Amino acid sequence: PVTLNEVAHSIFYAPQYTAIELGYFEEEGILLTLDTGFGADKTMTALISGNADIGFMGSEASIYTYKEGNEDFAINFAQLTQRAGNFLVSREQYDSFSWSQLKGSTVIGGRKGGMPEMVFEYILKKNGLTPQKDVTIIQNIDFGSTAAAFSSDTSLSDYTVEFEPHATLLELSGDGYVVASLGVDSGYVPYT
């Protein structure tokens, strides 16, 4: 048996779920167990501790583990996604959106040093904005709680960065509007 610990359970990883459901792993003689770590740090912990055989996460976790001097570090060997899978959600609906509109705003971002946050900051810089100077980024909200924080406290931020299904759920509830795709605006990156 092989235990795969994924960073998050998301439609973004549909190819993996399809392969599991269609029995492709079993056809190759792999009995796969799927666990969810809810964050690259937790997925890496599961991998290093032996609770997972494969960690499905962004490459940054491997780099951090190596830089900490761990002798039992992870080796990146495959790539499932080549773009960010998250979206910028605004409290306001725009006919036309430009990243420059974020100047002076507050955004619920991701964990400092995590792949979602690094890609978001890359896009800001690419559009002439300096993170934490031109745009205030909240980085202390748990990955699974950002959408709830955005919808429950309208004074907290102007925007949030969300994966599916949270981006769509915010739209359906009337609490936010998807205004940009980080995957489109960042271009190709070795995401997970």
Describe each PLM feature range.
Residues 1-10, 30-36, 104-108, 136-138:
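Short, well-ordered beta-strand elements
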Residues 144-192:
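Pocket-lining segment of extracytoplasmic ligand-binding domains
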Residues 1, 65-77, 125, 169-183:
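Ligand-binding "clamshell"
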Residues 91-106:
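Flexible hinge/capping segments at coil-to-helix
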Residues 9-13, 79-89, 110-124, 144, ...:
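Extracytoplasmic ligand-binding site segments that recognize negatively charged/polar headgroups
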Residues 30-32, 48-60, 69-74, 105-108, ...:
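Alpha-to-beta junction loops
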Residues 34-45, 58, 131-152, 162-165:
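Short helix-initiation/N-cap motifs at beta->coil->alpha
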Residues 10-36, 65-68, 118-126:
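Short, polar/charged alpha-helical segment
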